Amino acid sequence: MPNKLSHYDRAGRARMVDVSGKSAAKREAEASGFVAISAAVLGALPSNPKGDPLEVARVAGIMAAKRTWELIPMCHPLPLSLVDVEVRVCENGLAITSKVATTAETGVEMEALTAVSVAALTIYDMLKAADKGIEIREIVLERKSGGKSGDYRRRK
């Protein structure tokens, strides 16, 4: 493995990374995912009796990003300055994107990925009665900037 796994000590025990020696810096991350849904359910989205599932999913993603540190054991609580989640209808389902920013000692990749993941799970929850074949696919980090490891952009 080219890089040391930073969340383990020398004895192999899980640990939270000490970021106290790092300087706060502007950090951003973007993630995306896709929820495959039948055409019939896509066509019925506006009339869902539970409310607008796209808006509920968007808000759920924002809320989840802010609570990532409570969901993923070794994540730090971060002062997020931006969480933007978009859900848009595509030909075969719903495309979800997130953008998260902070000025802190560690990055926001996990927050961006959590936002997309929970938005996708919320869509599944709201539509599962109408379509048992819903598939959550391709949740990926698209881009990150800031920090010691430098910038990253996913190759497509």
Where are the language model's segments positioned?
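C-terminal binding/interaction regions
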Residues: M1-H76, S81-K156
